[in-house]
Regions:
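Non-catalytic ligand/cofactor/substrate-binding and regulatory segments of enzyme domains
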Residues: 2-104
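Activation targets extended, charge/polar-rich intrinsically disordered C-terminal tails
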Residues: 90-144
Length: 144
């Protein structure tokens, strides 16, 4: 197994369209040291179903759509271990278009992903709480 890689873990919040609290998009950005590839995980709707997407070598910090971010500290993990954990996070696909009450949102998936990282021993319960609380605060800065 390759050695673990150091990443700085960020919870990224992006403007929605329209920018409402239920349309703001969330991703987990694993920022690598200079010269190493970054990794971003998020879920997005594809043909009315949520799908996991991994972006490598994408620098989420350079997006013009960032509305806020939460630093969750450093994490030491191999990209393969990270992939296995992210792929294990349940994706819920509710039927309907009511995004306000949709448990299948990227926001809820991100909370479950943080909990999966905690269960695997990569982050602490305090970091999970800080991530979820920070996400909720930034998301609710949007118009209702």
């Amino acid at each position: 197994m390759p050695p673990a890689q150091e990443f700085k873990l960020w919870l990224m919040v992006y403007f929605g369209d329209p920018d409402k609290h239920w349309t703001r998009h969330i991703a987990l950005f694993f920022q690598a040291p200079e010269g190493k590839p970054h990794i971003t995980y998020h879920v997005k709707k594809v043909n009315q179903a949520w799908k996991l997407e991994m972006l490598d070598e994408y620098d989420a910090m350079k997006s013009i759509n960032i509305v806020g971010k939460v630093s969750l500290g450093n994490i030491s993990i191999t990209p393969m271990q990270l992939k296995q954990i992210m792929e294990s996070v349940k994706i819920i696909n509710n039927v309907g278009d009511n995004l306000e009450d949709d448990d299948s949102s990227c926001q809820n998936w991100t909370g479950r992903a943080l909990q999966a990282l905690e269960a695997a021993g990569y982050i602490t319960a305090v970091e999970v709480t800080r991530g979820i609380d920070g996400m909720v605060d930034i998301v609710h800065e949007a118009a209702a």
